[in-house]
Amino acid sequence: MCLQILEQETKKHELWIEELEKKQQLAEKKPELRKEYEKSYKKYQNLLKKQDHLMRVGVYLLLNLAEDSKVEIKMKNKNIIELLVKMMKRQNMELLILVVSFLKKLSIFKENKDQMKEMEVMEKAAQLIPSQNDDLLNIALRLILNLTFDTEMRDKAVKSGLIPKLVDLISLEHHSVVVTCILYHISMDDKYRSYFSYTDCIPLVRYFKVLFFVSWIFSNHFH
């Protein structure tokens, strides 16, 4: 039931956006319709706040229910990943944190990761880096870390411009370990090591040589 409500709300939001864009285009052609568009936009903003709250509660409930692996599999079969990916476009921080947390939880399984690959989750996660919200930044980095266990996902990470973004974050103590692990993953591919020469990351690349403990960190802290 909760999943169905979220699906309905997602479709409803898509219709709101479509209608709003039409009114905006008309207002651009006919200035006399500008006030009507502004009125519709304010109405949309109010509806959006209410919908964000409803979705936040829904995702929170599903995330907790997914602690049961059997329930999680049922959600997967009902396209929970596709629904969550659509919600990555939302602007509400609390909702985004829950959505990315859910994706991070699901991303430890290869079949889920493959689906996320098709839905460009890496590209969408890269857009969240950096974030002024520290909790969102933290969970987005952990999602990216899980995804970069896959070679193709590492390609997507580089093509999304993540390397310089990650290098800028490495000085933040509370994110440095996760960031270092992601960069370590990327550096395992010879073709991408040269990318680090265009950053302030040369000492870090050298440091990777002594990061043999990193596999232990992965298995004990990030899955």
Over which residues does each language-model region extend?
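Long amphipathic alpha-helical tracts in eukaryotic proteins
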Residues: 1-223
